Amino acid sequence: MRPVSGDPPTDPSSERPLRAGDWVEVRSLAEIRATLDGEGRRNGFLFMPEMVPFCGRRFQVSKRAEKTCYGSRFLRVGGAVHLAGARCNGSAHDGCELQCLTFWREEWLRRVDGPQEVGNRPAAAPVGRSAGGGSAVATGRPAALPTRVDSPGDGTVFICQATALRDVTREPVGAWNPRPYFHEIHVGNAGWAEAKQLIRWSLAWGRLRVFKAFSRQQSTPKAPRERIDVGDWVEVRSAPEILATLTKFGKNRGLRLSEDMLTFCGERFRVERSVTRFIDETTGRMKVMQSPCLVLESATCRGFNILCPRAQFHFWRPEWLRRLDGSSGAPPPDSPAGKPPPRT
């Protein structure tokens, strides 16, 4: 494991670490490259080709990256933030469709007063193929931004920020340890309103745990499946309806339903896209789904259990959704601008 430095601030112009709501400008590619080691990393955090187009642009900090999920574990990180809307498009990783929220070291950012960009935005360098088979930014430093390792006998293993999380993590975070929750409030990632949502997640966790304990369903049950297309408006079905489609392991055709997903029951969203391929962050292998899943606009993991800020998109089976009548085109009248109805 690579050494991890202490939590910054690392921008000498800042008087405190960046917090949610702060505005920043991503430094130029040349400035960022000057902070990277020979593997294109800074303290374990990988800078990817997909992040190059963000150079010179301004974003609002969505959360500090104090902790993260990795596989089935929760781990503490630090010294980085997430930027609102700055997601990986998978273009340098064979079209991975996860659209992960990227991690940004504070050294890669410059604090600014607001969203308005002054002057010309620096041009992004083109992304090309390196001699070793990976992708690299064409800036005169071959393979500076690797994306994969090709082995004749072992196939392709991808390298990205998600697969590299094991190199930046410090120690595991216990879901029942109260200290991380208070820390999230202290750094501005959450308020008491978010902390109260732990009750909502706990109820979903208990319901799913009881289901798994008493279910005897070995294979995926047959369930009505509507045709749902990209652009349709849908409502997440009730917990009993969704649980009726699962095996005793909490899966539907191999896809696991998480406790967090049960907190979306009754809410309405528009279908953003379908997903067929993604990189498994624990192995670096590309997985191709036999049955495509659906992604809903803004339906990302809320991280209620440990207030994780990673905001990964959930994958949904059509059986878990109800298509709203006449849903193509404009949003339903009781779901203005595509937002879910207020929670009660």
Model regions and ranges:
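Basic/aromatic-rich interaction segments and small domains that mediate binding to polyanionic partners
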Residues: R2-A20, L29-V127, G140-A204, L208-V230, ...
